[in-house]
Amino acid sequence: MTVKIGSLTLNSRVYVPPMAGVTDIVFRSIVRTIDPGCMMSTEMVSSRALLAKPESRLMDLAAGEHPIGIQIFGHEPDVMAHAAQLAEKRGADFIDINMGCPVPKITKGKDGCALMK
Protein backbone atom coordinates (compact mmCIF):
# COMPACT_ATOMS: atom_id res chain seq x y z
CA MET A 1 0.00 0.00 0.00
CA THR A 2 1.37 3.41 -0.93
CA VAL A 3 0.82 6.57 1.06
CA LYS A 4 0.99 10.00 -0.57
CA ILE A 5 1.83 13.16 1.37
CA GLY A 6 1.96 16.14 -0.96
CA SER A 7 4.42 15.26 -3.73
CA LEU A 8 6.03 12.52 -1.61
CA THR A 9 4.98 8.92 -2.35
CA LEU A 10 5.77 6.35 0.33
CA ASN A 11 5.86 2.62 -0.34
CA SER A 12 5.88 1.79 3.36
CA ARG A 13 3.51 2.66 6.18
CA VAL A 14 6.42 2.76 8.63
CA TYR A 15 7.59 6.10 10.03
CA VAL A 16 10.65 6.14 12.28
CA PRO A 17 10.32 9.35 14.31
CA PRO A 18 13.24 11.63 15.07
CA MET A 19 14.92 10.77 18.37
CA ALA A 20 17.70 12.92 19.81
CA GLY A 21 20.86 10.88 20.21
CA VAL A 22 19.41 7.96 18.24
CA THR A 23 18.40 8.70 14.64
CA ASP A 24 21.85 9.59 13.36
CA ILE A 25 23.10 8.59 9.92
CA VAL A 26 24.39 5.19 11.15
CA PHE A 27 21.10 4.24 12.84
CA ARG A 28 19.14 5.29 9.77
CA SER A 29 21.33 3.13 7.50
CA ILE A 30 20.61 0.11 9.71
CA VAL A 31 16.86 0.82 9.57
CA ARG A 32 17.05 1.11 5.77
CA THR A 33 18.38 -2.46 5.55
CA ILE A 34 15.15 -3.59 7.24
CA ASP A 35 12.70 -1.30 5.43
CA PRO A 36 14.26 0.67 2.55
CA GLY A 37 11.08 2.65 1.85
CA CYS A 38 10.22 3.78 5.36
CA MET A 39 10.01 7.46 6.16
CA MET A 40 12.52 8.84 8.66
CA SER A 41 13.73 12.13 10.08
CA THR A 42 17.07 13.21 11.44
CA GLU A 43 17.62 14.07 15.07
CA MET A 44 16.14 17.46 15.93
CA VAL A 45 18.37 20.39 15.07
CA SER A 46 18.11 23.92 16.46
CA SER A 47 17.08 26.37 13.75
CA ARG A 48 19.28 29.06 15.28
CA ALA A 49 22.27 26.69 15.46
CA LEU A 50 21.83 25.81 11.78
CA LEU A 51 22.10 29.45 10.82
CA ALA A 52 25.30 29.75 12.86
CA LYS A 53 26.75 26.49 11.51
CA PRO A 54 24.97 25.46 8.28
CA GLU A 55 27.47 22.63 7.66
CA SER A 56 26.18 20.81 10.77
CA ARG A 57 26.78 17.04 10.65
CA LEU A 58 23.31 16.55 12.16
CA MET A 59 21.98 17.30 8.68
CA ASP A 60 24.25 14.80 6.93
CA LEU A 61 22.22 12.56 4.65
CA ALA A 62 23.51 9.44 2.91
CA ALA A 63 23.16 9.02 -0.84
CA GLY A 64 19.91 7.22 -1.57
CA GLU A 65 18.55 7.94 1.91
CA HIS A 66 15.07 8.84 0.79
CA PRO A 67 12.43 9.53 1.87
CA ILE A 68 14.11 11.56 4.60
CA GLY A 69 13.19 14.66 6.56
CA ILE A 70 15.21 16.99 8.71
CA GLN A 71 13.60 17.95 12.00
CA ILE A 72 14.13 21.50 13.17
CA PHE A 73 13.08 23.23 16.35
CA GLY A 74 12.76 26.87 17.28
CA HIS A 75 10.14 29.55 17.78
CA GLU A 76 11.20 32.42 15.53
CA PRO A 77 9.36 32.15 12.17
CA ASP A 78 12.06 33.90 10.10
CA VAL A 79 14.88 31.84 11.61
CA MET A 80 12.92 28.61 11.16
CA ALA A 81 12.09 29.48 7.54
CA HIS A 82 15.77 30.08 6.77
CA ALA A 83 16.74 26.82 8.55
CA ALA A 84 14.11 24.97 6.51
CA GLN A 85 15.63 26.36 3.31
CA LEU A 86 19.07 25.14 4.42
CA ALA A 87 17.63 21.70 5.16
CA GLU A 88 16.00 21.59 1.75
CA LYS A 89 19.34 22.47 0.11
CA ARG A 90 20.95 19.59 2.05
CA GLY A 91 18.51 17.18 0.36
CA ALA A 92 15.58 16.81 2.76
CA ASP A 93 12.37 15.54 1.18
CA PHE A 94 10.36 17.23 3.93
CA ILE A 95 10.86 19.46 6.95
CA ASP A 96 9.63 18.15 10.29
CA ILE A 97 8.95 20.94 12.81
CA ASN A 98 9.31 19.76 16.39
CA MET A 99 6.23 20.78 18.37
CA GLY A 100 6.17 17.89 20.82
CA CYS A 101 9.39 17.84 22.84
CA PRO A 102 8.50 18.35 26.54
CA VAL A 103 12.10 18.53 27.82
CA PRO A 104 12.53 21.64 30.02
CA LYS A 105 15.80 22.56 28.26
CA ILE A 106 13.79 22.94 25.04
CA THR A 107 10.51 24.35 26.38
CA LYS A 108 12.14 27.07 28.49
CA GLY A 109 13.35 28.55 25.20
CA LYS A 110 9.72 28.57 23.94
CA ASP A 111 10.52 25.66 21.59
CA GLY A 112 9.13 22.12 21.29
CA CYS A 113 5.72 21.64 22.89
CA ALA A 114 5.84 25.25 24.18
CA LEU A 115 4.81 26.22 20.62
CA MET A 116 1.39 24.72 21.38
CA LYS A 117 0.62 27.36 24.04
Per-region residue spans from a language model:
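Extreme N-terminal starter segment of soluble prokaryotic enzymes
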Residues: M1-K4, L8, S12-R13
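Glycine-rich, positively charged N-terminal anion/phosphate-binding segment
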Residues: T2-K4, M19-D93
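Short, solvent-exposed beta-strand edge segments and adjacent coil->beta transition regions
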Residues: N11, E65-G69, K110
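Feature marks short, surface-exposed loop/turn motifs that line or immediately flank catalytic pockets
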Residues: R48, C101-K105
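Glycine-rich tight-turn/loop motif centered on a GG-T
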Residues: P104-K117
